[in-house]
From Swiss-Prot:
Induction profile: Isoform 1: Expressed in the light. Isoform 3: Expressed in the dark.
Gene3D superfamilies registered for this protein in UniProt: P-loop containing nucleotide triphosphate hydrolases
An annotated Gene Ontology molecular function: glycerate kinase activity
Residues given in the record as ATP binding sites: 215-222
Transit peptide, residues from-to: 1-63
Protein name: D-glycerate 3-kinase, chloroplastic
Keyword flag Secreted: no
Species, as recorded: Arabidopsis thaliana
Domain of life: Eukaryota
Amino acid sequence: MAVAISGSSLISSTLQHYNNRIYIRDYPIPCHSSNPICNSFNFKRRSFSPSSPKFNDHVVNPSSSYLSSKLSPIRTHSSFAACGCSWIQDNSMVHDYATTTNGTSKRCSALPTTNTVDVSSVSDLFEFICSGPLVNKIGITPQRVGQSIDKWLLYGSQLCRLFQLNELKLTIPQKARLYHYYIPVFIWCEDQIALHNSKFKDGDDVPPLVIGFSAPQGCGKTTLVFALDYLFKTTKKKSATISVDDFYLTAEGQAELRKKNPGNALLEYRGNAGSHDLKLSVETLEALSKLTKEGLKMKVPRYNKSAYSGRGDRADSSTWPEVEGPLSVILFEGWMLGFKPLPADVVKAVDPQLEVVNKNLEAYYDAWDKYIDAWVVIKIQDPSYVYRWRLQAEIAMRQDGQAGMSDEEVNDFVSRYLPAYKAYLPTLYAEGPSGSDPDRVLAIDIDEERNPILAN
């Protein structure tokens, strides 16, 4: 006789199951310590007391050789820039104090003062996850969260290690960034890969899924893709990351573009449509899609933005990173991915100089967008956020003793992109990218602090 179980009972029993197991196998050592320690996600057996609705942690001694053999080191993200923190774009996520490049400690003035929160309670974490703005949007039910809570714990622990966060004492913004943003998006990406793979038969060469990330500059898309790429690698899925920046014209090509468009500020520097090597884009995307077997390798283009006094040039091919098949996914990010050409009178009303950029944009669908199978579109409420985000980054760089643009230079830099944002974002947000399947587009609204929010 079948027994019906209510949703709440299923969640309760699932959490009880996960809280009576030992969270040890395949969990990384916490990033804030070089020695194995007992913390909220590692080396604890959690028991559930029916008489008391709370979880009790019991420490397990992790000194056995078996445990040591399971705790292999994981690479951490240790590059420091801007205000001396590993979170370059996501300032609200870093520790209140950071180490500058000369070894001195200073307060990060860009950070809000937030209280730390203890995430040791799995039941509290479950409730926090379910309160996020993305869970319903991507079809993650409370039942599914309960059934996969061990994955959420694992992914959270891995991201804490990557970004050198103390997983015992995450601030509320840190906790939200991981469990309301990065991990839900990663789970959505996993679902998209599973859907993609299901369309092929056993034994077929399955091309990697291409996920496009369209998001304005400074909103944190590079950090998001960095986190997703890391999680894919820790889950044994091979991934490749590329950016529209990788396909900018060479310095010589940029000079020719300026010469052909005298007086057009939108094409004076790299950035807008027309300043990319679309042939290289096609060659790269098609070559990556063929990395379906072990042993197949290729180098992926990269761009050196600091060359020629900041005008930039393609990096020497000897420095390009190498990727190896079989690839499961390609993460392709860019500020103008998915932009569609508009009628000439519409773009001229925004900025007359945008007309030639709009004409150039006609070639971009066949070079970029048609290769993208699924989309993450990060939406902002006001394009002027880009100016404030860029200004924050440059101020932080100057405070750290690095070369940064002045406020006036930031204004000039961003002004070359704002016409495109004003012209193309409304259509992108209303209709989605050209040729995209609405069921495979994840639209994420973020606020000025770069956190996901519920759309109005």
